[in-house]
Amino acid sequence: MKQLFDPKRNYEETRKLVGYVGRKQATQADYERIGFMSGLEVHQQLNTKLKLFCRCPAGVFQKPEEFDAELIRHMRPTLSELGEYDGTALMEFKTRKEIVYRISNNSACTYDVDDTPPFPLNREALNIAIAISVLSKLKIVGEVHITRKQYLDGSIPTGFQRTAIIGVEGEIQLKNKKVRLIQLSLEEDSCREVSDIGHVRIYRTDRLG
């Protein structure tokens, strides 16, 4: 008789094979042996009056049942500049999700639903990003270029997130050591998810932009 797969047993055997060491049992020598390094990506919403790429007010949040219209979208992947499809984008596309956006007239506009081009970058947000970069000893870039990061989970109606690098190669001084900072970026926020049931995913656009 064929033996049934035992997930717990498989997990324990895999831990032994890779030489897993529990966090509480790990020593400095263990980290040095595997050459362990880790980094953190920290996100912080800025307290600005307006959103990053349009003139809608920031920080105006609606309840799930408070919306003026619904918009339905189906996301499809596109080729990158290298002529390739992003693996994550293809995975999301295969879920065949129907994306529903709940829109409030008080917090969203045609830019947020990808019907008009972006407005000029919010100067208040840019100034805050530059100030943080200076305080963190980051080198300010000579030119700010808006780039795109592809997202097909529906959290951004365009299918990509507009983002810009503001500073690079900085550091924060702690009590006993310095923490190296690779870069600081300024990017638009995504929608807030209301639900994800079956093949329908619902978002609110109040935070978007």
Give the ranges of each region predicted by the language model.
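Basic, nucleic-acid-interacting segments
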Residues: 1-209
